């Protein structure tokens, strides 16, 4: 099973990916984790990524694509993977398609969790209130203004992936506002034929 979960911040992608990785025994491939691992391993591509990050710049698509390609070749990905935070742009999606094709692989599905953005903001505010009530530390970017900025960035940069994957016939849309168990069941229904 090779899967991409799409949706704005707070849509539940991480929750669903966690449930799917446990059930199917496949890894969740997070761009951030892959970058950190490549840097820690001091691989050639990791050294290039570190130099860019140390200079305070964004890591290029070329470097990210190569790191993803190498990670997909790892033995734990033999039965599939869930991509988290990649691709973020249409050029990355096109590179992923070429990369998988070159390895004789293809995506089984691209699942978009459709959510109401106002409800997401309320969900985030509730999470912050619960965190404060527990006496725990709140993340610096867990405030309505920062969250709305992340939503705008998602709409501008990542949302065009929906159109791209709709055009390839791989996109499946699920109501991300449903209870977690219902969302999981719907994802499983999509993946059964895969």
UniProtKB/Swiss-Prot annotation:
Enzyme kind, highest EC tier: transferase
Gene3D superfamilies reported for this sequence: P-loop containing nucleotide triphosphate hydrolases (3.40.50.300)
E.C. number: 2.7.4.3
PROSITE patterns: ADENYLATE_KINASE
Sequence positions that bind ATP: 10-15, 127, 178
InterPro entries, alphabetized: Adenyl_kin_sub (IPR006259), Adenylat/UMP-CMP_kin (IPR000850), Adenylat_kinase_CS (IPR033690), P-loop_NTPase (IPR027417)
GO molecular function: adenylate kinase activity; ATP binding
Residue sites binding AMP per the record: 31, 36, 57-59, 85-88, 92, 139, 150
Alphabetically ordered keywords of this record: ATP-binding, Cytoplasm, Kinase, Nucleotide biosynthesis, Nucleotide-binding, Transferase
Major localization class: cytoplasm
Pfam families hit by this protein: ADK
Tagged with keyword Ubl conjugation: no
Keyword rRNA processing: no
Pathway field: Purine metabolism; AMP biosynthesis via salvage pathway; AMP from ADP: step 1/1
Subcellular location: Cytoplasm
Region feature (NMP): 30-59
Swiss-Prot/TrEMBL domain comment: Consists of three domains, a large central CORE domain and two small peripheral domains, NMPbind and LID, which undergo movements during catalysis. The LID domain closes over the site of phosphoryl transfer upon ATP binding. Assembling and dissambling the active center during each catalytic cycle provides an effective means to prevent ATP hydrolysis.
PANTHER family per UniProt: NUCLEOTIDE KINASE (PTHR23359)
Assembly description: Monomer.
Family label: Belongs to the adenylate kinase family.
Protein name per Swiss-Prot or TrEMBL: Adenylate kinase
Species whose genome carries this gene: Brucella melitensis biotype 1 (strain ATCC 23456 / CCUG 17765 / NCTC 10094 / 16M)
């Amino acid at each position: 099973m090779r899967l991409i979960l799409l949706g704005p911040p707070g849509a539940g992608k991480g929750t669903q990916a966690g449930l799917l990785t446990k059930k199917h025994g496949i890894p969740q491939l997070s761009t951030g984790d892959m970058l950190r691992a490549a840097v820690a391993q001091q691989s050639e591509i990791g050294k290039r990524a570190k130099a860019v990050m140390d200079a305070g710049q964004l890591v290029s698509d070329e470097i990210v694509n190569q790191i993803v390609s190498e990670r997909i070749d790892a033995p734990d990905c033999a039965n599939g993977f869930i991509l988290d935070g990649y691709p973020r742009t249409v050029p990355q999606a096109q590179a992923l398609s070429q990369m998988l094709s070159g390895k004789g692989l293809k995506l089984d599905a691209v699942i978009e969790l459709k959510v109401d953005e106002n409800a997401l903001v309320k969900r985030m505010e509730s999470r912050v209130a619960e965190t404060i009530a527990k006496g725990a530390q709140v993340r610096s970017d867990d405030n309505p203004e920062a969250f709305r900025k992340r939503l705008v960035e998602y709409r501008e940069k990542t949302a065009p992936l929906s159109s791209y994957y709709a055009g390839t016939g791989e996109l499946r849309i699920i109501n991300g506002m449903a209870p977690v168990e219902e969302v999981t069941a719907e994802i499983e229904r999509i993946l059964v034929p895969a």
